[in-house]
Amino acid sequence: MSGPRSGSGSDGSTGRPGDAESRRSAYEKETHELTTQVAFLEEEVAMLRRKLSESPRQLRVLEERLAEIQAELSAVTGQNDRLVATLREARDQIVTLKEEVDRLAQPPSGYGIFVSSYEDGTVDVFTQGRKLRVTVSPSVNISDLLPGQEVMLNEALNVVETRAFERQGEIVLLKEVLEGGDRALVLGHTDEERVVMLAQPLLDGPIRSGDSLLIESRSGYAFERIPKSEVEELVLEEVPDIGYEQIGGLKSQIESIRDSVELPFLYKELYREHQLKPPKGVLLYGPPGCGKTLIAKAVANSLAKKVEAKTGGQGTGRAFFLNIKGPELLNKFVGETERQIRLVFQRAREKASEGMPVIVFFDEMDSIFRTRGSGVSSDVENTIVPQLLSEIDGVEQLENVIVIGASNREDMIDPAILRPGRLDVKIKVERPDAEAARDIFAKYVVPELPLYPDDLAEFGGNREATVQAMIQRVVERMYAESEENRFLEVTYANGDKEVLYFKDFNSGAMIENIVARAKKMAVKEHIEGGQKGLRMQYLLAACMDEFKENEDLPNTTNPDDWARISGKKGERIVYIRTLVTGTKGTEAGRSIDTIANTGQYL
């Protein structure tokens, strides 16, 4: 301590108390300042230590806050995207609705029928009952427009689009195509004549007189050829597949109709050399079920085959068989039946003009061509009969058409139809006698059928002999004038009486039915475990069943009319009494009152 003070003295200091005090005061002040600074630094260090210790927690809070803010930002961004999408969708809907409103607010478009075009780019169209000259949109090629084609028109009636041809309208009958080929004379529903224009489809395809055409009456255009459905319902053009060999018991009738129908077609030159006119018509008459329709079908088939053979297979070698369903010709509307008859003969003329033989067959001819004035509640025959007469007389100019009629009441057909020059040839198809019945049975009972072993053994296994014996036995049973075969007792107007047997009412249809019954018996017997094959016993039983089934069929209200239909002619019948006994012969015959009921026709 003494050193410094010595030093101080040596430096020239006097060592006075005032100086020391000031120095001490300066030291104390400096010390206080340093102490204050140290304290401040210590507090700063402590604060920094606290902050350092608290920094991780704050960092985590900040990180969490940052994450929350990012999540909120993402949510806001997604919401903003959805809002943008919603706005875009709303804008699209507004645009679509505006287009729909604009579309619905557009004026309606019209339709017209194209008629013709001109060099200046205008065209004539028919629309709303008026013929107009209009312009064409640049999007439509005028050269593609066809006469009769439908076109679309805008509000200004300009062509803006092409359409197809009209598919609906009125059906008319083509009478003839007029000069120039683009017009036609047609007949309407009431036979009213009018001239129409032919649309392009009809100009491109062949049409003939008698064709049915579809027209649009307002524009006067015909668009389409319609198949003749109304005629197709009444006729069968294809030749039936029935030959003479399938018909039994009618040899003389077949020969007569072949001479009348086939010879004039096959030997035209000979007929011309002999100045012989071929018959224009044939009437087949007789009781029901005796083969009139079969003969007509067979002659058409035979004629077709012979024409083909004569031409050596050249050409089609066809014949046409127009089978007219008589009652279906009748129509409640005035003039319709006559129109149908004209259509039928028009079809016949078309086919005949092609060089092919045509047979027009009227079945049940008495139902539509009755004697004029005989109608009870109508006089429709007064116009139908003259229509047929005019058509038959018109056939005179044709070489390949013949009319065949079939009826079981020829007395009801108008005499003008039956006179020579119309239905020239009249062939009676009678009920089969015993020989004819054997021939008919032979068509259905043939050696190829399964035969009962016992019956076959009786004839030494000879199938031909067995079948012949079966047929002979059942025919003898049918045609025997025995007590059990008695059917009717008829009383004539003069008081005479006559007993009629079942054989007097036999027919080919009845024989076919008897054989069918017997075959069914054989089938049932085999199904139930019995032996297989047709036997004589079944044929005899079927014959009795057929007789028994028909005992109530005679018409007793008007016996004379019934007799005429059944083929009995002569003295007028006033009373009918059945004589049928039971299957065991124990039931008594019974009389049927003439006022009982209307009955049926046998």
Swiss-Prot record:
MF (Gene Ontology): ATP binding; ATP hydrolysis activity
Region listing for Docks into pockets in the proteasome alpha-ring, in residue ranges: 601-602
Region of interest (Disordered), ranges: 1-31
Entry-linked InterPro entries: AAA+_ATPase, AAA_ATPase_domain, ATPase_AAA_core, ATPase_AAA_CS, NA-bd_OB-fold, P-loop_NTPase, Prot_ATP_ID_OB_2nd, Prot_ATP_ID_OB_N
Note on domains (UniProt): Consists of three main regions, an N-terminal coiled-coil domain that binds to protein Pup and functions as a docking station, an interdomain involved in ARC hexamerization, and a C-terminal ATPase domain of the AAA type.
Any one GO cellular component localisation term in the record: proteasome complex
Coiled coil: 19-106
Low complexity bias: start-end ranges: 1-17
Taxonomy, superkingdom: Bacteria
Gene Ontology BP terms: modification-dependent protein catabolic process; proteasomal protein catabolic process
Protein's recorded name: Proteasome-associated ATPase
Reported function: ATPase which is responsible for recognizing, binding, unfolding and translocation of pupylated proteins into the bacterial 20S proteasome core particle. May be essential for opening the gate of the 20S proteasome via an interaction with its C-terminus, thereby allowing substrate entry and access to the site of proteolysis. Thus, the C-termini of the proteasomal ATPase may function like a 'key in a lock' to induce gate opening and therefore regulate proteolysis.
Lineage per the UniProt record: Bacteria, Bacillati, Actinomycetota, Actinomycetes, Frankiales
Binding site for ATP: 289-294
Positions with biased composition (Basic and acidic residues): 18-31
